[in-house]
Each structure stands twice: as structure tokens, then as C-alpha cells.
Amino acid sequence: MILMRRLAVVPLAGLCAMLTLTAPTGAQTASPAATQRADIETLQRLYNERFVATPFAGLYQIDRPIPYSPRETAPILVTRDGHYSFNNGKLGAQHGDTGAPLSGSEWGALVLRWRDQIRYPDLIQQGGNGPLRMLLLSAFDCPFSKKLEAALAAAGTRYAIIPSTIGTANKPFLPDIWCSPDRAATWRRAIGTGALPPRASRSCRYDRRYFETLSGMFGGSKPTALFADGTIVASPSPAFVKQKLATLSREGIAF
């Protein structure tokens, strides 16, 4: 089904698609409550679906059952007025009126509307404290993520992780990793050996909705990298990452 005022979860297809995007436009700012209510009313008239606000201004969400797993759901994210959507389970983004996929440049520019709302300190930092030039949607239980992150660690690469999993069974462990005293080291152990930390205390402030929304904006495929110049790559090779980060360093581009 296409997205013509109808929304459907599409199963994830292949990885390894490399896309380049343009400079960000139309940066989003915080939405007052009245604006959120008006946006939601507009979307509910368009789609006859129940929408809720997300942690990102101007971006709203519905949940749909995952095909062949009716007790699990995946978020579908829709911009105000229904112009564009991110369908978690489908790589990339779509036009809201036709369901046609956005080009790489359109998708990336759409993500970067919210670059100022990304809580960078809440991401899992790896490779020191230098300029941040790459964000990586990664899953500690994903073989592709494990292989890539091992190579990045060996090279001393500086990047920040949006933590995720490849299924729902391991999602309860994400707060344990994030709330551990050293989340960077805990993540490395989890992805490298499968070792998990003790359960997080009830005071843990892990923001599940925030991370799931951010994951959905990246398309849901793990690993996916977003570079500070707007290049977005699914399943990037270590060689590409090294070359891209060197270019960004020479050009002085960072988040």
C-alpha cells in the first residue's frame, strides 16, 4: 500500500544504500500546545487516525501493528499538514500525499530540520570528546552494527550512537545500558560480547519515546549514519566513514 492519506508499515528491505542530501532548510522550533492541538486536528481529518505529539516540534506519530507480529507496533511519523512521513520499517521517507519515496537529498534535508532539537549529550558518545561529525543509529544485537562498530573502535573514530535493537525482545535492556555509570563502555561490552549491565534503577530517566522517534527519522535500518554535512548512509563501510570524516575535518564541518 502507498501512503495516500493511508498509512501502512512496510517490512524492512535491504541495507547498504548511500544517499547524499542538501543543506537543511526550514529548521523546526518548539511547538506551543495550541499549535500541537491544531496540527493534530488537521492530521486526524486528513488520515482518520489518532495522532500524538512527539518530542520533535512539528512531527506527529501513530502506531501500527508490525506485519506478522500483531502484538508489536512500529511508529509512523508524519509532519504537520501531512506533507511527509517517516515509516519505521521502510528505509527513508515518503511524500504524504502520494506515498512516493523521497530522494536522498529530500530525506536528509527533512531530518536536518530537527538537528537543533537532537539532544547530543544524551547520545552514547564514542571515541573521545573531539568535534562530533557523525551520528550512528546502531543496535547492540545487530551483527552488521557489531562489525562496523568494532572497526570504528579500532580506528579511534569519534561518533555518537542512537541506541536501538533489531527487534523488541531486547528493548527492555536499553535503559539499563543508557543509565549505567559509563554508558559508552557498557554499550561496547553489550555490542562486543553480549554482556548486559544490572537492571536500571527506577530513577533512570531514559526517554524511550525520544530515542524511538529519532530512530524512526533515520529510517529504522541499523546501522545508519548521518554525517554533519547531511550525507546519510545505510550500512556504511569503515573505509567510507574514515574518508568522509577526514573530508569533514578538513572543511571544519561538525554538528
Locations of regions flagged by a protein language model:
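Extracytoplasmic thiol/disulfide redox context detector
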Residues: 16-18, 26-136, 141-172, 189-222, ...
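Acidic, Ser/Thr-rich peripheral helices and adjacent loops at domain boundaries
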Residues: 173-190
